[in-house]
Each structure stands twice: as structure tokens, then as C-alpha cells.
């Protein structure tokens, strides 16, 4: 009778974090991961550096100031009558040919835009990855709690099985069956404890100071994603694809710069030279040009190389869009099937296991079913609830993964 009373007791899931404990919610984890993320700061620094470089690239090169002596005689100095020695000061300025300065500045701005888009894309990837890690940690922790409840119930079953045996009415086989069930429950709890520790370690990659906090008792309420066709059409605006688009812009800027390289740079020099002995001082002006006499082996080859890289950027952009589309299709189908499986577990698997346990409880009270059969049914019910729990986590995980493609918040 005592065994029947124990078996009829309601199964109560472990509550959430104790009162007053600091809880790490789904939103908290995603916010903390973005607040202190070295990868994002590195990209922001790189983008800012490129922006600053664009100003420098649009500016003329620094001029050169020359000081020196010219026509210094090696014999007869200083009594030579035709002394042409001059002490001179000159100013030299290089001027890049064509629109090189403007194009260099535009190229730096394009690179800054690409790095900013990469930072946005990385931010979205981090939100997805920390969300997945949080769901994994929640699922593992909840499963460990459930296994702990099963272990405690089987510990009680062992004690209750011993009571009839002490009065000579019980069966040693029932005690052994209870001990075997307890041993299996302990092993399952230890296995889930390992999984929970690994999940917490993975979460600490994103929130190292907060990964050890308690997690809520329930998963957040996730929204139904937009229709698949609508998400497909929005992939052109996906942050990661935008990075590829801007990378193509950088490659096109490199092509324009390579074409401009055939326009020679100029160097202008103006100088003043003084002579002694009452001789007239002199001024000097000269201009130098680069001569692209090897254009077929240098500038033309550089243009061809940059054109190839620009084609590569375009092909990578197209391939990346295909990759996004394939990932979206897979993520959407995974989310849909996870929902179907969860509904089946809730409406069929768990109710069937509960009905089987209730029937065996009734038979056991009437002396028609063994304790081992009841314990096996009890474990079957817990396994069903464990499956329901795992499928809840799988549905949440697939929804978080899908939010990476929908570019929207995954929950209210």
C-alpha cells in the first residue's frame, strides 16, 4: 500500500532559481555578449582606422625641403676665379597623377563601410551563437533537474520495497529491481550533469562573468517566424550578404586605382641659390614626370589582376547568397519539424506513458503487476518527459538559428 501511495504521488518539476538568486535570462545573455565583445571592438577600431585613412589618402604628399651646396670645386678652392659654388634652398612637391587621391580616399571609405557591415554581421552572429549556447545550457540544466527528481523517487522506491521484505511479505527480487532502477537513474543524472557542465562552458565563451548564474525555470516565448517566401526576399539585405556587396565595392575601387596608375605622377621643384663674390644669385624651377614605358608589363598587368579580383568578389557574393538561401531553407524546415515532433510528444508520447503507468499502478495495488514493471513504466514516463523537454529545447534552438536569417528578434 505504501508503494502504491508513493507511485500515485504527482511528479513535480524542479522550480526555477531560488528567491534572490541572480538569474541569467535569454535577453541578458545576448545583451552581455554584445556589451563586452573583443571581436566587435576590433572591427570597430579597424573601420575607424579606415575612415581616418581616407582623409590622409585625399591629401597631397608631404613636400620636401632641400638644403645644400652646388658646384663645389675640388681644386683651387677658394681662390678659383670662376667659382660657381652656390648655396641653395629648394622646395619639392609630388602630385599624384589623375584622380589617384580621390580614388584612394573612396577606396578607404569603401573599406570602412565593409568593416562596419562586417561588425554588424558579427553582432548578429554573436546574438545567434550566444542564444544557441543559452538554450543548450537551459536544456541541459532542466534535464539534469528532471533526472535528479527521478533518482530521488527511485531512492524512495528502494526504501519502500524493503518494508514488506522485513515483515516477510515482500520479494527480494523487487528490492533488487528497485536498486537496479536507482543505479540506472544515478548514471543518467551523472551523464546529464556532464552535458550541463559542457553547455555552461560553451556559454562562458560569450558571457564569462555570468555563465554560472541560475537560469529561468521556463524558456522565453518565441514568436512565429515570418513566412518563408518573405524571408527569402529579404536575404539581399542580410548583414552578412551586405558585407559581400561592400567587399565587391572595395574590389571595384581597386580596379579604378589600377587603371589610374597609367597616369604619371608629377614632381615640381622650385629653388633659390646664392653665390658669393658679387655674382648674381640664381633661381631654379623644374618638373619631373614618370614615364610608363613598361605599361604592358606593369600597369596593364595590374589592371588585369584587379579585374580578376573584382570578378572573384562578384562570384563570392553570388555564392554567399546561395549559401544563405540554403541555410534558410534548412533552418526553416528544422524549426517546422521540431514543432511537429514536440506536439506529438505532448499529445501522444507523454499521455501514453502516463496511462501505462496508471494502469500498472492499479494492477500493482491489486497484486497483478510487479514492482519492476511499475518502475520501468515510471522510468518510461520520465523518459517521455525528458524527450518533451529536449524537443522544447530543439524547437527553441531552431527558432534562434532561424532568427539569424530573418534579421528580427526571436521572442517578445
Show the residue positions of the predicted features.
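A glycine-/polar-enriched beta->alpha junction
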Residues: 31-41, 48-63, 78-80, 89-106, ...
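Amphipathic alpha-helical coiled-coil scaffold segments and their short linker/junction regions
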Residues: 30-36, 174-175, 179, 209-268, ...
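Amphipathic alpha-helical coiled-coil segments
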Residues: 42-57, 122, 126-147, 156-158, ...
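Residues that define the transmembrane beta-barrel architecture of outer-membrane proteins
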Residues: 83-87, 279-283
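Periplasmic alpha-helical coiled-coil/stalk elements that build and connect Gram-negative outer-membrane
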Residues: 24, 122-237, 331-338
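Transmembrane beta-barrel strands of outer-membrane/channel proteins
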Residues: 65-71, 268-274
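Short, charged, amphipathic alpha-helical segments
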Residues: 105-109, 172-181, 371-379
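Terminal intrinsically disordered/low-complexity segments used for targeting and assembly
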Residues: 1-35, 52, 71, 193-233, ...
Amino acid at each position: 500500500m505504501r508503494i502504491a501511495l508513493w507511485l500515485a504521488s504527482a511528479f513535480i518539476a524542479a522550480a526555477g532559481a531560488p528567491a534572490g538568486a541572480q538569474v541569467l535570462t535569454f535577453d541578458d545573455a545576448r545583451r552581455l555578449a554584445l556589451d563586452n565583445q573583443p571581436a566587435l571592438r576590433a572591427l570597430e577600431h579597424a573601420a575607424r582606422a579606415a575612415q581616418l585613412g581616407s582623409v590622409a589618402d585625399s591629401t597631397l604628399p608631404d613636400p620636401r625641403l632641400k638644403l645644400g651646396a652646388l658646384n663645389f670645386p675640388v681644386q683651387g678652392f677658394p681662390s678659383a676665379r670662376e667659382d660657381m659654388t652656390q648655396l641653395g634652398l629648394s622646395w619639392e612637391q609630388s602630385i599624384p597623377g589623375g584622380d589617384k587621391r580621390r580614388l584612394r580616399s573612396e577606396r578607404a571609405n569603401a573599406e570602412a563601410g565593409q568593416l562596419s557591415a562586417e561588425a554588424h554581421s558579427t553582432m548578429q552572429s554573436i546574438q545567434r551563437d550566444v542564444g544557441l549556447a543559452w538554450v543548450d545550457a537551459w536544456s541541459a540544466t532542466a534535464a539534469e533537474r528532471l533526472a535528479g527528481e527521478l533518482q530521488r523517487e527511485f531512492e524512495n522506491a528502494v526504501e519502500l520495497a524493503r518494508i514488506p521484505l522485513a515483515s516477510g511479505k515482500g520479494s527480494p527480487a523487487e528490492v533488487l529491481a528497485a536498486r537496479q532502477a536507482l543505479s540506472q537513474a544515478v548514471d543518467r543524472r551523472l551523464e546529464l550533469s556532464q552535458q550541463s557542465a559542457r553547455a555552461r562552458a560553451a556559454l562562458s565563451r560569450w558571457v564569462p562573468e555570468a555563465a554560472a548564474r541560475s537560469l529561468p525555470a521556463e524558456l522565453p516565448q518565441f514568436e512565429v517566424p515570418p513566412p518563408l517566401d518573405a524571408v527569402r526576399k529579404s536575404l539581399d539585405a542580410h548583414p552578412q550578404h551586405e558585407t559581400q556587396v561592400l567587399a565587391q565595392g572595395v574590389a571595384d575601387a581597386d580596379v579604378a586605382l589600377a587603371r589610374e596608375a597609367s597616369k604619371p605622377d608629377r614632381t615640381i621643384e622650385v629653388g633659390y641659390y646664392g653665390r658669393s663674390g658679387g655674382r648674381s644669385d640664381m633661381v631654379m624651377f623644374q618638373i619631373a614626370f614618370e614615364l610608363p614605358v613598361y605599361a604592358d608589363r606593369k600597369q596593364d598587368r595590374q589592371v588585369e589582376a584587379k579585374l580578376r579580383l573584382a570578378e572573384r568578389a562578384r562570384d563570392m557574393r553570388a555564392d554567399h547568397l546561395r549559401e544563405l538561401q540554403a541555410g534558410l531553407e534548412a533552418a526553416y524546415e528544422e524549426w517546422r519539424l521540431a514543432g511537429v515532433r514536440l506536439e506529438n510528444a505532448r499529445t501522444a508520447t507523454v499521455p501514453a506513458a502516463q496511462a501505462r503507468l496508471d494502469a500498472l499502478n492499479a494492477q500493482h495495488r491489486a497484486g497483478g503487476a510487479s514492482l519492476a514493471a511499475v518502475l520501468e513504466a515510471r522510468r518510461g514516463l520520465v523518459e517521455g518527459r525528458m524527450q518533451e523537454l529536449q524537443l522544447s529545447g530543439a524547437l527553441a534552438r531552431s527558432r534562434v538559428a532561424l532568427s539569424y536569417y530573418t534579421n528580427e528578434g526571436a521572442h517578445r
